[in-house]
From Swiss-Prot:
The keyword Cytoplasm applies. Residues 1-37, 54-73, 348-396 are annotated as: Disordered. GO terms for cellular component: cytoplasm. It comes from Rickettsia sibirica subsp. mongolitimonae. This is Antigenic heat-stable 120 kDa protein. It is found in: Cytoplasm.
Length: 1011
């Protein structure tokens, strides 16, 4: 009995046969396809006399049709050349995966299940139809090699069928290209008349090209494709004009509306087989899978992803429903191709979904076709596949065999809840449970027969049902309620204020539930807040968040839990993308309501206040940097004016109410902005110097020394982390240190610069370079201070009357203090020293103490500034200077001619600025002394006014005629005269060099004037 024989299930393939078949497919493609040739629509018709019978079997369900109707050779060829090879490859991959499975017992069980079913000469439909095997099938289909192979089989199979059964190959009534004819009235409408081989008309096909507003579809890898043109074909449902069979094979179009090349073509084929009355009946549909629709309305066009490309099919969702209903009525079956969903009928839709942009509007969810009473119930093993439909991408699609929410809702909301609960009980996969809940929510909001109030009530009932459903695990309840909330968020038809009512009621149900733990309640609450924050207009967002806060306070939660929930609301607001002004307003409301309701602990209040402070600081920072940029890019202001203005901004920041840490962050942004500007490096360094001086000189009462150090470290960090080049950063670091010295900043402030470098996010070599720049600036500043002190002491003219001279004033203080003591001693008749002698002794002691104190302070200052010991003490520097002077004098002595000596003086004493001014002057003095001693030996009787030598005797001279009793505490330097002859040129050169060096700029910076 051929009706009970399945030649496909009986067909076994050895490895060698499979390889041979694959090779034949490749050869077939290379011989029969030409990439440059465009694929054509085709059709094949036969009369009753040509119809050949084969068993009518569902390659997807494995069941013979109840009435034992037969199918023609075309259908058989599709199954044999496409479906079965795809199945074989899929099973082969599943067996490979089972061999690698760690659970050996399960692997062996499944392997035996497959082998035993094969032995019964079946097409493994039981294995494919078992939901427990879905994970093995899905895993196999994740292999890119398998997907590519299945697509290759499909393309080769269609080419094979179309060529084998083509009219060109001599097959009676075989496939031939459709000859479309344009309608005279419209260029986008075409038609063709299909006749059987006897010349009788079977039907008229109408094709419409739709040029639509572009909409976007998402591919599996997440990339998006725009569709602006596709076509629709009005496939016939009932045919009663003439006898025969008909197969309509329509090529899928590319995203741009053009036909692909033949080597990439896939087809949507409708199989009309001769029925009992001789008329064609729609028995099967061959379509590449997963089949998807660009929307939920009946006019949504079908599309597929094949070989990484998007193709549109010439069938709408409404037409597909009609055709599938007719297939079922005619006891036929859909033939699904290409991927897992192509082969395993009744196990649900694929995981990919299209992304529909706002340009593509969608209507309400599709209601499944209503079948006549005599049609048996559709089961998972014989139900036609429901195609995918979605408005947004998601990770998992709901099982269409469980979901009929729109139909259930057409009765009553209770019917829908009963239906959903039955599905939740039956389905153990939590992902599918969640999808069922989401689909129910979508059906509620898309129900055109319901008004807003009814939709709100139904959504609230669904949320409550989800929370209280005992068949849902806690995590599934969270995900289910969140799915309802997400559906509310994505609904485009419900006004925002009406959404608010749904959100408030849902939050109340969640928080008052006794079936949820606090953690789960918080997760759902956070999702509700997210939905509120996603609303487009400011007013709706504010009202929604306030409403949710009110609900939290009014619930039956404990005081502690209410505080926790309010903090969760505040945290969501704080991390949102709202403007700072909106965040401040919303967080301020959370704090105010929480304090008034006495549900926030002091720690929680402090946390919210910290959020508010940070937002305030961010806003201040943003505003400040805008002002700084305006100043930097002002073409009418010079560097001095820019510096003054930025100093004023810096001062305002330091005087502000923010914490020292926040002030430091703002100052860091300022220096970083200056450093990254397009100004010249010298100009940027000058501005940075002004910032450093402003920080160093800021009032200690409003900004403590540790806080100054913290802010100064931040200032340097802003420089160090700027994107400008390293030499510029080094120069600006020096500028910052110079600013500190100009502002008389202490060593703690200078050391903070090193701290800022250490804490910056730069590499070690850059840190080392910046530290060297900082130390060099500190060294130079100390040298200037020391030199200024030395010059100040040297510059005091003892011969002139200076009533305000430091030493004179100190001497007067000593006299005033000593006189009463002397008078008391004289009265006691004890021997005393004269007043003059006492003054000399005291003054000498004071000078000595001043000298020691100066040396001690300088050395301590250097030690504090250089924790790593890389700044030398004054004694070390003096010893180093003496050594360098001796080296220069010795080197000078090696020059024999006057010209060489003059050149040495210019090169090493005048031009070499790397030597300190002090070393060069000491060298000149020593060389002059040597030159003059030599001349004095030659002519000891001749003296000159130009040479000063220390006299062998000391004598104190009166300060002035008005004060004859007070003598200056310094030895008088006598003058000798020597003869200047042979070395006059050298001595002249030395003295000229001395004058040049002494007139050099001491690099003193002019303090910035403040208004």
């Amino acid at each position: 009995d051929t009706s009970e024989f399945d030649p496909l299930a009986n067909k076994e393939y050895t490895e060698e046969q499979k390889q041979t078949e694959e090779q034949e497919q490749k050869e077939f493609l290379s011989q029969t396809t030409t990439p440059a040739l465009e694929a054509d629509d085709g059709f094949i018709v036969t009369s009753a006399s040509f119809a050949q019978s084969t068993p009518s079997m569902s390659a997807l369900s494995g069941n013979i049709s109840p009435d034992s109707q037969t199918s023609d050779p075309i259908t058989k060829a599709v199954r044999e050349t496409i479906i079965q090879p795809q199945k074989d490859n899929l099973i082969e991959q599943i067996l490979k995966d089972l061999a690698a499975l760690t659970d050996r017992d399960l692997a062996e069980q499944k392997r035996k299940e497959i082998e035993e079913e094969k032995e019964k000469n079946k097409t493994l439909s039981t294995f494919f139809g078992n939901p427990a095997n879905r994970e093995f099938i899905d895993k196999a289909l994740e292999k890119p090699e398998l997907k590519k192979k299945l697509e290759s089989i499909e393309i080769a199979g269609y080419n094979n069928v179309h060529n084998t059964f083509s009219a060109a190959s001599g097959y009676p009534g075989g496939f031939k290209p459709v000859q479309w004819e344009n309608h005279v009235s419209a260029s986008d409408l075409r038609a063709t008349v299909v006749k059987n081989d006897a010349g009788d008309e079977l039907c008229t096909l109408n094709e419409t090209t739709v040029k639509t507003k572009p909409f976007t579809l998402a591919k599996q890898d997440g990339t998006q494709v725009q569709i602006s043109s596709y076509r629709e074909i009005d496939f016939p449902i009932k045919l009663d004009k003439a006898d025969g069979s008909m197969h309509l094979s329509m090529v899928a179009l590319k995203a741009d509306g053009t036909k692909p090349s033949k080597d990439k073509a896939v087809y949507f084929t409708a199989h009309y087989e001769e029925g009992p009355n001789g008329k064609p009946q729609l028995k099967e549909i061959s379509s590449p899978k997963p089949l998807k629709f660009a929307g939920t309305g009946d006019d949504a066009i079908a599309y597929i992803e094949h070989g990484g490309e998007i193709y549109t099919l010439a069938v709408t969702r409404g037409k597909y429903k009609e055709m599938m209903k007719e297939v079922e009525l005619n006891q036929g079956q859909s033939v699904d191709l290409s991927q897992a969903e192509d082969i395993i009928i009744g196990q649900g839709q694929s995981k990919e979904q299209p992304l529909i942009t706002p340009q593509q509007t969608t209507s309400s969810s599709v209601e499944p076709p209503q079948y006549k009473q005599q049609v048996p119930p559709i089961t998972p093993t014989n139900q036609p596949l429901q195609p995918e439909t979605s408005q947004m991408p998601q990770s998992q699609q709901v099982n269409p065999n469980l979901l009929n929410t729109a139909t259930a809702l057409s009765g009553s909301m209770q019917d829908l809840l009963n239906y959903v609960n039955a599905g939740l009980t039956k389905e153990i996969d939590s992902n599918k449970q969640i999808d069922l809940i989401k689909e129910a929510a979508t059906a509620i909001l898309n129900n055109e027969k319901s008004d807003i109030a009814e939709k709100q009530a139904n959504i609230i009932a669904l949320a409550e049902n989800t929370v209280n459903n005992k068949n849902l695990k806690p995590d599934a309840k969270v995900a289910g309620v969140n799915a309802v909330l997400e559906t509310i968020k994505n609904d485009q038809n419900t006004p925002n204020l009406e959404k608010l009512k749904m959100l408030e009621a849902t939050v109340a149900i969640i928080l008052n539930s006794e079936n949820l733990e606090p953690k789960q309640k918080q997760q759902m609450l956070e999702k509700a807040v997210d939905v509120g924050l996603s609303l487009k207009d400011d007013a709706s967002r504010a009202v929604t968040i306030d409403g949710i806060k009110d609900v939290v306070i009014k619930t039956n939660l404990s005081t502690e839990d209410k505080g926790t929930m309010l903090i969760a609301v505040g945290d969501k607001v704080n991390v949102s993308e709202l403007s700072n002004a909106e965040k401040q307003k919303s967080l301020g409301s959370v704090l105010k309501k929480g304090v008034e309701a006495q549900v926030l602990s002091p720690a929680q209040q402090q946390l919210i206040q910290q959020h508010l402070d940070k937002i305030t600081a961010e806003q201040i920072k943003k505003d400040t940097i805008k002002k700084v940029n305006d100043i930097l890019f002002d073409p009418l202001s010079n560097t001095e004016l820019k510096t003054t203005n930025i100093q004023a901004i810096t001062s305002n920041v330091l005087d502000g109410p923010a914490t020292a840490k926040v002030k430091g962050e703002i100052i860091q942004e300022i220096t970083n902005t200056v450093a990254g500007s397009s100004l010249e490096a010298q100009d940027k360094a000058a501005i940075i110097k002004g910032i450093g001086e402003t920080i160093a000189t800021h009032s200690d009462t409003s900004l403590s020394l540790p806080n100054k150090a913290l802010i100064m470290a931040s200032a340097e960090k802003g420089i160090a982390e700027s994107q400008t080049n390293l030499p510029d950063r080094e120069l600006m670091t020096k500028g910052l240190v110079d600013g500190i010295y100009e502002g008389k900043g202490g060593p703690e402030i200078t050391k903070a610069v090193s701290s800022g470098i250490d804490n910056s996010n730069i590499n070690d070599s850059e840190k080392e370079a910046l530290k060297k720049a900082k130390d060099a600036a500190s060294e130079a500043a100390l040298d200037r201070d020391t030199q200024n002190l030395t010059e100040g002491l040297k510059g005091q003219n003892i011969e002139e009357h200076k009533p305000h001279d430091d030493i004179y004033n100190k001497a007067r203080e000593v006299i005033n203090a000593v006189n009463p003591v002397i008078e008391a001693l004289e009265k006691s008749k004890e021997p005393v020293v004269s007043a003059e002698e006492r003054i000399v002794q005291e003054t000498s002691s004071i000078l000595n103490n001043i000298s020691k104190l100066a040396v001690e302070k300088v050395n301590n200052f250097r030690a504090m500034l250089s924790p790593n010991g890389n700044l030398k003490t004054l004694e070390e520097k003096k010893e180093e200077s003496i050594k360098k002077v001796d080296e220069l004098v010795k080197a000078f002595g090696t020059k024999s001619s006057t010209e060489e000596q003059q050149s040495f003086i210019k090169t090493n004493l005048i031009d070499d600025k790397t030597l300190s001014k002090e070393v060069r002057l000491q060298t000149i003095d020593k060389l002059l002394q040597e030159q003059k001693r030599a001349e004095a030996i030659e002519n000891p009787s001749v003296k000159t006014e130009d040479v000063r030598v220390v006299s062998g005797k000391s004598k104190l001279k009166p300060i002035s005629k008005d004060n004859p009793d007070i003598e200056k505490a310094k030895m008088v330097v006598g003058r000798d005269r020597v003869n200047i002859k042979g070395n006059i040129k050298i001595m002249g050169a030395l003295m000229n060099a001395r004058d040049i060096i002494q007139s050099e700029n001491l690099n003193k910076s002019t303090p910035i004037k403040r208004e």
